[in-house]
């Protein structure tokens, strides 16, 4: 009985993990922000589910729609950060991030939007309102 339960649990975990998509971080992580810069960071692991990918896609789209001029000038940015990548560890440590997170940072002050961001991951309008 124990072996059957273990086998079923292992199979379920395998199915759950196979739904995640491997994706490399292609964005460079900037060092510290100046007084006028605002950055939205989406911290994630290498393996991500559909909701995780939706948070990134809709957050990035919202930032680009809300602040097009600021994005062009570099005073407002969206950065996807893979926290499994050791090169990003110092940024995650500096901001106190240990897992998946959606945060807005200005002058080393951060607003954590993780809970609401994941709750509204598939609702672009609500996520856009959060990032306003």
What are these regions (language model features)?
Residues 34-65:
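Local sequence-structure signature of Cys/Sec-based thiol-disulfide redox active-site neighborhoods
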Residues 104-132:
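Non-catalytic, surface beta->alpha helical segment in thiol-disulfide oxidoreductase systems
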Residues 1-4:
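Positively charged n-region of N-terminal signal peptides that target proteins for export
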Residues 72-86:
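Thiol-based oxidoreductase modules, predominantly thioredoxin-like and allied folds used
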Residues 92-106:
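Structural micro-motif
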Residues 20-23:
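Bacterial signal peptide processing site
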Residues 64-74:
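Signal peptide-proximal N-terminal region
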